[in-house]
Amino acid sequence: MLGAVMNIGEKLYASDRKDWRRWLEANFNREKEIWLIYPSKESGKPRIPYNDAVEEALCFGWIDSNVRHLDEYSSAQRFSSRKP
């Protein structure tokens, strides 16, 4: 279906590495996935660098995967726990 809005589940905006790590510490063993929001440069909002997000996720056994465009000012990337 062209033009359909995709439901991507629970989203999180973390403005920096510390916010992302705090969320992971509290939720890595309770949640199966989270879609981390990346604001565009044009939005003017602070954003966690991709490499920082991946490094923190790996510390908790999580990996990155799909990216989805949300709107003209943001996208979201799926992070989830690795399969054992």
Walk through the language-model features, giving the residues of each.
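Charge-dense, helix-prone N-terminal extensions
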Residues: 1-84
